[in-house]
Structures are given as C-alpha cells and as structure tokens.
C-alpha cells in the first residue's frame, strides 16, 4: 500500500519554555502583556465601531458621560473554590456545589486596567464571560460608581492566511483519551483503529481510503496511572513497574502506527508531563520503540502545525473544560468559538488554569486564525464550520474520549470535511 505524503511544519516554538528563566516572578506580567496586546487591537477597531465616543481609562470615568473603556474582565464568583476555604473553620457554611460548574446567580463582572477597576452592570451577561478576557465596553458610570454597559466589542476572529487549494483527498486522524491502564481501556478497540489506519483491515476501498491518511494526532490523556501511586509516599519497587506498564503498552501500539505513517503525540492532564500550560512534549525516552522512527513527533499542548499549508491549532481539552466550569454555553463548540473571538486559547489561565509565569509574552494569544481548531478529551464528537466576517473559515472539532466512545475523527485536507471512525468490540445481539 503506497501512502500519500503531506508537507509538515511544526509551529510549537512559541510554547517552548526551555529558554525561560524562572526567578520567582508572579503572574502580573502575563496579564499586563495580554492587556497591552489586546488593547492595541481593540483601539484599532473602535473607530469603525463607535467613532463618536471617547476612549478613557477606569480612573477617567465621569458620571453619566458616555464613553468606551478597555480592560481585563475579572469574574467575582460566590462558589469559586478558594484555598482559604480548605482551612476555614466555617467550611460547612459554604454551600456544596457540583464539581463540574461553579456558577451562581449572584456572580458579577469587574473590568480592570492599570488605573483601577469598576463593577459592571447592564447589558453584559456574567454567564458568558470568564476572568482574563480583554474587551471594550460602551457605557457610562452610574451614581453608585458602577459602569452601566450598553454595548460590547470583542476582538473577533483574527485574520487568516488563504486556505490552499488541494486537489486530492488527504486525511488527518485525531484521537484522544485512550486512557491506557484504566478500567475503561479496551486494547482490542484501539488495535482495530491501528489496523484500519495502517491498512491491515477492511476491503480494497477502505484500504484505499487508509492510504490517504497522511498523519495521526493523539490529543492527550493517552495513559492512566492510578492516583494511589502518588500519595506523597515513596513508590515501592514492585509498584514502579506497574506505573510504567501503561506507557510501555502505549509505546508498543504507537510503534505500529509510526512504522506506517507520521504521528504527533500531545500530552494531556493525565499524562506524565508538567501540569501547567503550555505542557511540554513528553520525553522521547518514554517511547523506546516509537522514538526510533523519524515519523514520531512528541509535541506540546497547545499544538500548532501546518500540513500542506493548512494551519492547525489544538489542545488536549483543559482550556475548554475550564471554561465549562466557570461560564455557560449551549455546547462545547460555543466555548471553542469564544476562544477564537476573544483571540485567546486559555483566558482563564493563570486564574483558574495553571500556566507558566511568562514575563514578556502571552503564548496563548491567537494572532492568526487557523483553518482547523481541535480540542481533545470531550464528552462527545461535535464539529462546525465557523465563518468569520472577513471570510475566514475554521473547522472546529471536539474529539471524544476514545476509551468511552471508540470514536476517532478523520478530517479531509481538501475540503475540511469531517467524518468519524467508530470501533466497537461488543458482541451483544
């Protein structure tokens, strides 16, 4: 079987932290950098939005006078967990909440810039926003000292490079949430996926389609290591081999894939990688078999790359899962879309999502619109072709956990159309 090829460029340099020096700095730098960058963008958009209104700072607000302010949102949440609550004697007074969402009707938004902060009221729904988003607001200060919002300006979907014209079918397969080592993991199910991709399964037609698969992206949470091994105690020698077993099994299965085609390996929240974003590539020494092939690429999370000039950006899901905890939307795709409109992959970092304390940049800013934006480890498969005001076209993909669904996602580079690969090993009648 002759496999098609695609020209690949890894664009993960901006997420590398090897050159960074940690000197005890806090997170104010990353917020300042974000505000400075986004404010310049929003100021450039104001003349075409509300050219007759003055732009002022929070400190420069005057009661009853219409104006525009630009700043970073802070969402005051009654139910948001606090480290102080862990040690509070009055802990029982705090209402119990479901761990998946911390929203409350009394939540309110505050806008902050270098000069000060002001509580927001009016036409801005707290449920739709999170801490860390930079926006412009039209409104006026009230006698109570609040800012009454009348209209909102977001940065919007960023500019996009032209989508190349590809005349033949070439596919990228996305899979996430393998959870090798967990009770849910079904090795036969994953082996069926591998056999299908490598062309060892199916009739001539299916093998012909498989030969058009040019790359596989594994979007995080590939292994599951029992938390009981990480209780602060020294790991017994007999348990050390058990910890390594899921990684060894993953390596054996990856080796089958990389022997046939290129594979990008992204870390996730459950993988043996650093906790905070951007997660650095999994060390190649973990993959004794797969790493011997030049088709194996260990990548960061977030991961950005180009295939035949089609630009991809994606995460292993932590950024969208965190938005789900602190805001509301009709589905996960709406959260994904919001991060594009806010031009920021992870607005809740570093407030509620761990990230590295950069001093001179915010690597999660989205300066160029991708053609494909994927998010791993979601509850179900969802996709949408999003169109921007400047004719941008973005394929949004929520990749389901494979251990739960047996579903991988296949994208055609020619037209950005998506389909699923579903595998089941159930023998029920």
Swiss-Prot record:
Q: Give the chief site where it resides.
A: nucleus
Q: Kind of enzyme, top EC level?
A: transferase
Q: Which GO terms describe its cellular component?
A: delta DNA polymerase complex
* Keyword annotations from UniProtKB, A to Z: DNA replication, DNA-directed DNA polymerase, Nucleotidyltransferase, Nucleus, Transferase
Q: Which CDD domains match?
A: MPP_PolD2_C
Q: Fetch the Gene3D superfamilies from UniProt.
A: 2.40.50.430, 3.60.21.50
> Is-annotated flag, keyword Metal-binding?
no
Annotated EC? 2.7.7.7
MF annotations from Gene Ontology: DNA binding; DNA-directed DNA polymerase activity
A Gene Ontology biological process noted in the UniProt record is: DNA strand elongation involved in DNA replication
Summarizing the function annotation, the protein's role is: The function of the small subunit is not yet clear.
Q: What is this protein called?
A: DNA polymerase delta small subunit
